[in-house]
Amino acid sequence: MESKAIARHIHQSPRKIRKTLNSVRGLKVGEALNQLHFSPEKAAKIIEKTLRSAVANLVNNNEKLDVNPEILDVKEAFVDGGPVMKRFRAASMGRASQLRRPTSHITIVVTDEK
């Protein structure tokens, strides 16, 4: 069985999130959660929350099946770019410079199959 969780409109660039997300792809869920919990990155906290949501989705949506969270694997983990918020900042000589505030969408798929 597979289950998916998506975190949308995360206020961090996809490039920064991808750095942390690549380290948990393909791991067992327990190992991935342990690695994310002790990571100092801001993205690690968001990825950990999304991973826990994917595990909860699998357990709660398949109540008839006996699913053990210990044997689950992270099958897919990827990040896509979300909408970019464009803001302006005052610059010298009466000008304005543009600020880009990128957002991201994180998708994590967990499975109990090999």
Predicted regions and their residues:
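Strongly charged
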Residues: G82-K114
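Ribosome large-subunit tunnel/peptidyl-transferase-proximal elements
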Residues: M1-V79, S104-K114
